[in-house]
Amino acid sequence: DLNQGKRFVGMSGVSNTSALAFGGQLNPGLTANTESWDGTSWTEVANLNAAKFIGGSNGTQTSALFYGGAPGSPGVATTESWNGSSWTEVGDLNTAREGLGGAGTDNTTALGFGGNNPPQAQTEDWNGYNWVEVADLNTGRTKMASNGTVTAALAAGGTTGSNTTATEE
């Protein structure tokens, strides 16, 4: 079990033996806590620079990104990069938002898409240095399931104001 009970957590990893869980919403409050999974147990490691939740995330246990999220409305634009031992704040999203989907393989490549209330279709591409706006989702949505790489991403479900079954790749 995680060392700290929380929801709306960022996560990265490519297997059930190597993962990272970070940030999240407590009851009450937020956390900057980061925990590393070794296939058997969670170990607390270096915290995020700022507590937040419900952001986009991607990567591995040793190279991850956490971008956007909350607190605040319409969310935050900050991006934090994990190098395997610590978090560093890097270039902000062009548009602050929460509830966005994320895809990417490490802390040098990512897509952040959708998010916010009302739901947005906006998509941004992280090139390792900054975010660039690219082709939007066909259906603006927030709080969707997401996965994949920058060249093969998937967004499924979420809410457009009501729950949706829309899937885009």
Model regions and ranges:
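Polar, enzyme-active/binding microenvironments
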Residues: 1-169
